[in-house]
Amino acid sequence: YAFNTDTYEEIFTLPVSQVGGKKYYAVTFGDVRLVVLYVTNMWRTPSLAPNARGKYKECDRTLNTPENWGYGQHIFEPIQPGSTQYQWLESELNSVEFKQAKYKVVMLHHPLHTLGDNIVPAYTNPRQIIERDADGNITAVRYEYPKEQDYLSRDIVPLLEKSGVQLVLYGHSHLWNRFVSPNGTHYLETSNVGNSYGAALEEKQRPVPNGYQEEYTSIGDPYGLDPILPAIAPLFG
């Protein structure tokens, strides 16, 4: 989860867009129009331990040295409306190449629907909250991520579904997930594993903070879709 993509771009021969370079682009393979987005952020631990510099808080021992703060799970490339990438995506979804494609596929890193841990907190810029004692000394620095400001669920998902995208492919949580939205868009999460071990389902919960201003979903898909779970039933007729 590094901001520097130079090595990746040097190793792989990638399509290039005029605006996004090798970071986000679109290409046609036969009947498929593939749109690749640059949607990723700085991964930080969800731990609330005193020595943790995580997505929800700063390390206690660095409270008075802001130059050592991590500033939460910040986003590498803007994707919200008005950003360069969002405007490029709008243009691509309205292009002749996209509209004429039989199959419309979008690929990105961050999940849109998942049972995995990494969809929480919301994909939005962290909101810093500094707590002080009566003498003005910093006692805590924490970060909130308002769910209603999630750029992906609020802005990107409606845009993709309205444009007729049939499949959205992503990774990040290192498990296998499949969802289908009411309008028929398929959401598939996969990586180097073909199982759903570690999914936040039933007794397994995500590590989320309690007592914060925002509520962070510990079980299930935070954005309301039921998973289509893998089964061996079809093998038995």
What are these regions (language model features)?
Residues A2-V106, P111-G237:
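Metal-dependent phosphoesterase/phosphodiesterase active-site architecture
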